[in-house]
Amino acid sequence: MLFKGIRLAVLLSGMLIFSPMTPAQIVLKHPGWEWRISETGCAEQLIFKNKQRNDTVPFFRKGDHAGPSFYAKREGKEIRAPWIPDGYASYRSEIDGVLCCISYTKVHWQPALRVKLTNESSVPFQPQKAGLKLGIDTYMDKYPDWFGKYFPTLMRNEKTHFYGYLQTPSGHTLGLVSQQPVASWSVDYNLGYQDPAPFWFMGHRIESLNLDLLNALPLPSRHPQDLYELKQGESKEWTFLFINVGKLDNLEYAITQAADIPLIDIRQTSYAAHEEASFMLTADTPEVKVTNDAGAELPVVLTKAEGKRWIGKVKLEDAGLYTLSVRSGNKVAEAVWTVHHPWQWVMKKARENVARYHQKPTSHAESWYGFYSAFLAARYFPDKTLDKQLSDYFDQLYNKLHDPEKVEPLYFKTRIQNTSTTIGMLADKYEAQGNLEDLKKASKLADWMIRTSQRDDGAYYNHGTVYTSVIYIAKSVLELAVLERKQGEQDPFWKDCAERHFLSAKKAIDQLVASQGDFQTEGELTFEDGMISCSALQIGMMGVLEKDAETRKYYTDAMLKILNSHDCLTQLRVPDGRRRQGTMRYWEAQYDVQMLPNMFNSPHGWSGWRAYATYYAYLLTGDEKWLEQTFNAMGAFANLIDYKTGQLRWAFVVDPHLEVKQACSADTKLNFSDLSFGNPHPKLYDTRKFVIGEQYVNMISDWQTVNTQDNDVHELFKCIGETVLTNAFVIERPNGEVVGYNCRVSGKGNTLTVKADEKQIVNLHCNLKQPFSVTFGGKSRSLPKGYCDWAFGQSGY
């Protein structure tokens, strides 16, 4: 019995300590952690105690997002019920005759939450959603506070259980697992602004992570399909463990130590046709099968490793999706590999889709982003008729948006990302066609932008806001400078241009480095995917271009610090090749495909920004993890083109159950080639309601005439063109194994023969610990011990 004003603590080895700080506040203590619970029954903070430092998981302390709290959604409205004390560290609440009981406790030495739902009403309970608003503080609104906030990076529902993790930009990972099936999950996205009133656009922040214990159908087939209701008198129970994972590399080990669930670990999620895929599995007695999308099984070799770990191998077939299914006892798990078509096929199909989905002259460069794909494909795989059609239309669009004499934008001049994007397109057009007039236009546009929009400290800006990392202003200028340097070998005019533009970009990138993570971006400030990834990639590109070892290391270190902080926004562990390496953007659908509300679009066109950065990280460090991440990303990107039909999709939506509204009627006042400015709200048009979840979303620029930005998906094919389309990589691993990416490697002794997977792959990068003689493309070179650089050809920079 606890008496008012008296603290009671019982300490036994490994036991939980209950310590009331006030009559209403409770602190649950354990040698490794401490959980503080407020007088409302919601958590205040969860502190994990480590030898070097403590890691604190903050919870919202007041308002609608405090939690854990019981909530239900029905008829489009959410109800949140307050807790009533129901025993020590236990609480209850009720909605519509459904009783929810929770207890804060310990399971397997981990802080845990036991949850029980009981339908005490006289009718079935069939909400749209019902469960817990978890309450962990996910609201990233200012620097440097956001380094301690938790982003909901991965939530994974299997038919028999649930797991996932949240991660901070500073690198701490919080695992979450339940051995009971959970219907679904969702997040609450904030509202942004009205334009025009009364219509709302969504914001750039996340207010809550919700564990939806019950959820209406449809749900993805991998989810439990029977948790859409609670019958009269029925009860269901769940236990959620909160696991101090620490570094993300510990995720699978930490989860399997605390929960008896089969866990699939696939480090490479994308392959070329007929390659052998491997996976690691933690399970007791697994039954494993791999099927293609027609349901045919492929032979799997499963080998027992240490403890409960198993290593599996399977030879995949033609382009498509391959599902790995695991059963261990009464638990099941699933993973997906992608096998991509040759990169040549991908780029040709991307170009075809540039013509299918209209490129539109608007206030936003995203609406004509497809010209990147058009000019890259034209450079490597000429198609006289289609290339002329697209080139002529680009010229028409360019002339509508620019003053031909002054060579500067006619509209929205402060949206300098439009200008830098046009510079990049003109550079690619020049490389495809060899017309020096395109390079001259790009050079003059760069001069205009630098003159009007670069501060003394180097930052490119828009009305006082640093815009260097809105898309990637400096990278586009560097792409131009690289081409000007080549021309400058014969012409001093171009040499001067190259030097001027290179120094401008360098100043801008040095300002990013000096910002120490305190970056700025377009729109509502948050720890924003593109702001972080574009800063990392531009610093990385500068490092690649630098020849001085000390300067190169300076940029490398700065880039890696930023790139590592971006991990929390990236799907680095999801066992699904369609999504792997996608970045977790969530406010683009309203602008790109006129769909509301917010949703995780991953991969989305802007996922390409991180992939440039991981590519540069590999070139600068030789660490294979960055190359693996790059190729996983390219596989996910390639799969946005339907491998059966060649049709381009806009993005993959991660949320498992979303009730959306999408515009379904075209604007009748404008044609595709007419100027269109601003972001027309979806509700200005006829809309339809429907449910989506874990699926691709189609493009709309084939029918919507006004400004939409779904063509930003072409950033992914630009990224493919710059990183893997013409490049192969050979790596000697620490154990002496030599592997190839985009190539096949055979060897005898200290001799390696490398055969490219495709004929346009003419550059070979070698990362070797021992000296080797390497043959590639009919040529041979002797490479010294520790060689890590381009051995044949060059990267393009």
Regions found by a protein language model. Name each.
Residues R267-E275, S363-H364:
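Short, solvent-exposed loop/linker segments at the N-terminal edge
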Residues P23-Y193, E234, T239, R744-A756, ...:
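Beta-strand-rich N-terminal accessory domains
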Residues M1-V10:
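Bacterial N-terminal signal peptides that target proteins for export
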Residues F18-S19:
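N-terminal signal peptide c-region/cleavage motif recognized by signal peptidases
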Residues I311-E317, T323, V332-P771, G777-S780, ...:
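Glycan-recognition and catalytic cores of secretory/periplasmic carbohydrate-active enzymes
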